[in-house]
């Protein structure tokens, strides 16, 4: 989505920037094959989570993808998880990434830590979780707006705290088909698929030596 971006200059070398040539090559690769690449690729390269106390206690995140089919109805989600808060599994509620202790031996609870800030507090504001859902259902622009709104429930299920003044979250919805589906079913399914994509972003992310500045990802610490 060309109208949205994440702030990732605090991770790795801030002088490394994407170019028009990189964008052109990314489009060519996207159309050339069907392999899905997730984790630290594309917009997920510098994504991190758990940044209530800045980058030193954060963890690596990335780009996540998920898709499901219900008969002939298809729904896919893609998300870059670059959140202030902690990340939780949509299946069992277990924390899978987030704010680390100062010695990085365990997790801190971002919500509990946030409750310490009784007076106005400058937070690490470089946070944006950007997601999109794409379906083959036949929906109007107004209906897609509603589906995008329902998809946001996935953020609340998987990210806590979420929608803070330090977050700049966005969700987009697009229709590329003509399958007739109830909008309530579609929006509910979109939230489920987005939650899976958020989890996928965490599980497939890993640190890259050339970009090392902050914390390991869950994949590197297992």
State the predicted function of each range.
Residues 59-70, 74, 112-121, 156-159:
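Glycine-rich, charged/polar anion/phosphate-binding loops
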Residues 131-166, 180-187:
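Hydrophobic alpha-helical bundle architecture
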Residues 213-222:
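Single conserved hydrophobic/aromatic residue that forms the stacking wall/gate
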Residues 186-194, 199-201:
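Helix-rich interaction surfaces within compact, conserved domain-sized segments
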Residues 1-9, 129-140, 171-175:
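Short glycine-rich or small-residue beta-strand-to-loop segments that form or flank ligand, phosphate
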Residues 1-91, 95:
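Glycine-rich, mobile lid/loop segments that gate access to catalytic sites or pores
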Residues 78-79, 83-127, 131, 135-139:
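Glycine- and Gly-Pro-enriched alpha-helical subdomains that act as flexible
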Residues 161-179, 200-209:
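Basic polyanion-binding and macromolecular-assembly surfaces
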């Amino acid at each position: 989505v060309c109208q949205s971006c994440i702030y990732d200059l605090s991770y790795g070398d801030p002088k490394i920037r994407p170019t028009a040539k990189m964008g052109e090559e990314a489009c060519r690769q996207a159309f050339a094959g069907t392999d899905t690449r997730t984790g630290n690729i594309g917009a997920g390269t510098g994504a991190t989570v758990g940044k209530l106390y800045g980058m030193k206690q954060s963890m690596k995140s990335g780009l996540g993808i998920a898709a499901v089919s219900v008969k002939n109805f298809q729904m896919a989600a893609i998300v870059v998880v670059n959140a202030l808060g902690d990340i939780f599994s949509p299946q069992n509620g277990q924390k899978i990434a987030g704010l680390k202790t100062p010695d990085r031996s365990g997790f801190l609870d971002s919500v509990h830590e946030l409750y310490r800030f009784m007076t106005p507090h400058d937070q690490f504001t470089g946070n944006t979780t950007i997601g999109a859902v794409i379906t083959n259902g036949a929906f109007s622009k107004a209906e897609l707006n509603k589906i995008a709104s329902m998809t946001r429930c996935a953020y609340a299920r998987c990210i806590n705290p979420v929608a803070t003044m330090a977050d700049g979250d966005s969700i987009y919805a697009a229709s590329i088909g003509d399958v007739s589906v109830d909008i309530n079913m579609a929006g509910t399914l979109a939230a489920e698929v987005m939650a899976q994509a958020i989890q996928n972003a965490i599980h497939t992310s890993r640190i890259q030596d050339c970009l090392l500045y902050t914390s390991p990802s869950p994949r590197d610490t297992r």
